[in-house]
Amino acid sequence: MQKPPLLLRRPLPPKFTKLSLHEKKTHTAKTGKIESLHVAFTEDETTSIKMDRTRFPDVLRNQSLTPINIQNIFLDHCVQERVTAISSPQKSTKHVREQIPDTATGSIFFPHCNSASTRIFGKQTNKMESSRKFKTMKDVYTEKRLENILILSSKFSKPKSTPGSVIAQKLEKMHPKHQPLPESPGYTYQHISRDLSATVPSPPPMTVSMKPEGQWPEHFKSTATLTLRVTEFPGFVSLPTPVLPRKPHRQSVIETLVTENGNIESVPKQIPPRPPEGLTKTEKIESEIHVVRGEGFKTVAATRYETITAMTNLAIVNCQVYGRNALNLKGFFILNCPDLTPLAFQLIYLNLSFNDLHYFPTEILCLKNLQILKLRNNPIKEIPSEIQQLEFLRIFTIAFNLITVLPIGLFSLSYLEELDVSYNELTFIPNEIQKLRSLEKLTVDGNELSFFPHGILKLNLTKIQFENNFTHPCFWRDNYLNNPQQLTQIISLFIVQNKLHKFYDKIPVEVQKLLKCTSRCEWCHGPKFGEGFRVIRSCDIFGASQLPVMFYVCSPSCYRRIKESSFVLDGSPSRRIALDVELSKEL
């Protein structure tokens, strides 16, 4: 026998009161800020709600939403359940924009399912709605709480006035969206809900005793019932880190350094692994072939001067190892010069300025190829004549010392080009300076000089500096005052100039000693006995003006001639040096 085809439609619902034909009013809710409500829901909670005949449209959300799986929908059945409903008297519906309070926790569910009567008579209702003209609704903004919204929570105590009971059984889960309907009307419905646990912390749940409720009254039995069960719920949700107050850059750097230092101190010291005990003696000898052993100076236990001495010795070793020809020990404040014999044929430059050397360092004399020597700012009082051993010395600086006399050996340096003896205690310069025929620059500032010797006119100087001395013309008169000559000196000069000693065959020994000429006249270049007569003449030479030059002459006649002369010969007939006649007449 052929079975009639199954009808795939729902059974007719019980009779309802006649629906009014007025236009269905819709509720629209827009929220700009999520605020906390009083109740929330979690997993495995079954709740039902009384569905209004009006339906709620989707609510706009800016964040990701969690789907809710509705297991079964029982139509016109009385089931024991726990109901949480927030109801309010019906008012005229408009587009409503609500503010959700900040205390809202858990999840908020906005129903999107139509009532049973709407689903059954949906076609007729749609026709009636299409025949009516759509009216624009005004937007209304309110600060009141949202109404007609279901709030579900796993731990929630409903008010005593709300009818309902706890459901004792769990319904089966149905995953496919399109399946034949079973005897008990049920289907799977994906709905969008809002999870606020990621942004707002949940307060502790309220503990209110729940009492089982009795059966629903008759006027509630005609309502549609929704049984919800959450199957998918977000797992662990990380809360955003609180925004700390802004710190100044300097404070942040200090805290970072303190943290790093604490981490360094907390790190345990690494103990090097011990070598295996099974190594033989031959292996130890082979491993020690490439080991470099030496001793370094320790500044912790040593004094300051010992440290400085070690540094100077290290500098000498570096010059010796790397073949350096210059050694700079400037500003070490050493008391004694280190041993320079390892660099005897290597160094050509040595700087010992700004130290505490009280004596001229004789260790320098071993440097055979030394060309530049600087001893500036040391308390040296004397230069030894042995300095002539530095044959190739070209530049010699010994300024800001305590030198009183220039040795004769200094004028034996035939290659000397620059001589700086400024700011010492020199009272005169020997006439032997004329031997320095290579000298080009002479600096004698800050001494006690009143004049220069006659021999300086024989040099080929390009520059001379003599500031801060007693060379002004007002000091000349005190320096060239002459004493009368002795009678023996006058007679000796007369005998020698007239060659009278040749007329005598035998001359006493004492007279022979008196007739021996010890010096020459700087004007006539004849013999001069005794000190002679002194005279200062001003010269404009070597780029300087009024350079005072002292002349020692043999007789009053030479004294008168040099005073009246406008030039002087430097020993060679081809060279004449102009003299300032007017200045000499004033004196």
Swiss-Prot record:
SMART domains: LRR_TYP
Swiss-Prot/TrEMBL keywords: Leucine-rich repeat, Repeat
GO BP: any one term: intracellular signal transduction
LRR repeats: 251-274, 344-367, 368-390, 392-413, 414-436, 437-459, 487-510
Alphabetized Pfam families for the sequence: LRR_14
Superkingdom of this protein's organism: Eukaryota
Family annotation (SUPFAM superfamilies): RNI-like
Name used for this protein in its record: Leucine-rich repeat-containing protein 63
Organism per entry: Homo sapiens (Human)
Gene, per the UniProt record: LRRC63
